[in-house]
Every structure is written in C-alpha cells, then in structure tokens.
C-alpha cells in the first residue's frame, strides 16, 4: 500500500524556516504528516501545520513530489505562509518549534529534508524526484513502520 505525506516550508519575515521537533523520534522536521483517506495533499498540509504548530496557514506553491519507491511512499512538499493562530510548542506530536536560517539547519533532521529545503532554495517548482534511501536510513524507516510510529 502506497503512503502519502504532505509537508510545508514556511518562512517568517526574516526568511527563517519553521521546524518542529518530533516526539516519536528526536529529530527536527518540517511541519507535516500523513495524508488521510479522502483528503488531498494540500488539505493534509494545512491540517498538519495547525495540529503540529498551532498556526493556520495558506499554501502558495507546490515545490514537488518526492518518491521513495523502496517504501512505497511519496511526500508532497509545499511552500506556505502563516495566516493566523498561536504557536503551540508542545503538542501531541511535537516537542518543540523553532525558526532557523536555511543556511544553519540542525544536524539532526529527518532524512532527505535538507535536500528538499535545498531544492526550495534553488527555486524548484512542481518537481518529481525519486529518492534513494541509504541502507541505514532504510532500516530505521522500516523499523519505525513496523512499530507503528
């Protein structure tokens, strides 16, 4: 079964990217998550930002779709902006929020996010990319899926 995720790059006035610290694994990530049945990737992206950060958001562009055939997974990446709401640093899925310069991303990030952020910085729009996960990353992802996280 193919899974789909939707993630969003949100910039503030200082051109910093909003990151969330995940509770399931101690890594920084873009706001986002799984697309629910009957939901579009765009709807999922907006919903996930609200659930993970407390912010309402609007999407302005699709950066691309990142295919991970080894795991039958595809991730939709969007660019968006905050339209309201209030920061929620500690939620059910999120252990923290922070704004970071695109040139100073944290060391511990979800695999492939830095590449996606670099694609955005380089002007990517509506690209379709096939990602090859390393053996270690593949093993971690497989273990996570089997544990239901």
Swiss-Prot record:
Which Pfam families does the UniProt record give?
NUDIX
Deletion phenotype, per the entry, is: Growing cells lacking this gene have an unchanged spontaneous mutation frequency, even in triple mutT/yjhB/yvcI disruptions, however they are more sensitive to DNA-damaging agents such as H(2)O(2) or t-BHP. A double ytkD/mutT disruption has a greater mutation frequency than the ytkD disruption, as well as an increased sensitivity to DNA-damaging agents. These properties are also seen in stationary phase cells.
Q: So which cofactors does this thing need? A: Mg(2+); Mn(2+)
Q: What is its EC number?
A: 3.6.1.55
Q: Which residues belong to any copy of the Nudix hydrolase domain?
A: 1-123
Nudix box, short sequence motif: residues = 33-54
Print the keywords alphabetically.
DNA damage, DNA repair, DNA replication, Hydrolase, Magnesium, Manganese, Metal-binding, Mutator protein
Look at the named UniProt entry and state the broad enzyme category this protein falls under: hydrolase
List residues binding Mg(2+): 48, 52
Under the GO molecular function aspect, what terms does this record hold?
Answer: 8-oxo-7,8-dihydrodeoxyguanosine triphosphate pyrophosphatase activity; metal ion binding
Reactions catalysed, semicolon-separated, are:
8-oxo-dGTP + H2O = 8-oxo-dGMP + diphosphate + H(+)
Record GO biological process: DNA repair; DNA replication
Keyword match Chloroplast: no
Q: What does this protein do?
A: May be involved in the GO system responsible for removing an oxidatively damaged form of guanine (7,8-dihydro-8-oxoguanine, 8-oxo-dGTP) from DNA and the nucleotide pool. 8-oxo-dGTP is inserted opposite dA and dC residues of template DNA with almost equal efficiency thus leading to A.T to G.C transversions. MutT specifically degrades 8-oxo-dGTP to the monophosphate. Functions, in conjunction with ytkD, to protect vegetatively growing cells from DNA-damaging agents such as H(2)O(2) or t-BHP (t-butylhydroperoxide). The 2 proteins do not however protect spores.
What the record says about family reads: Belongs to the Nudix hydrolase family.
What protein does this entry describe? Putative 8-oxo-dGTP diphosphatase
């Amino acid at each position: 079964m193919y899974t789909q995720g939707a993630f969003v790059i949100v910039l503030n006035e200082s051109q910093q990217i909003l990151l969330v610290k995940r509770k399931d694994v101690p890594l920084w990530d873009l706001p986002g998550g799984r697309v629910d049945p009957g939901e579009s990737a765009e709807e999922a992206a907006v919903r996930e930002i609200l659930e993970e950060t407390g912010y309402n958001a609007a999407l302005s562009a699709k950066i691309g779709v990142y295919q991970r055939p080894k795991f039958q997974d595809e991730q939709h990446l969007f660019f968006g902006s905050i339209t309201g709401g209030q920061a929620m640093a500690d939620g059910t899925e999120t252990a923290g929020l922070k704004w970071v310069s695109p040139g100073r991303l944290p060391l511990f990030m979800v695999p492939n996010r830095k590449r996606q952020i670099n694609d955005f910085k380089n002007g990517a729009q509506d690209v379709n990319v096939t990602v090859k996960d390393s053996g270690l990353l593949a093993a971690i992802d497989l273990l996570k899926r089997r544990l239901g996280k």
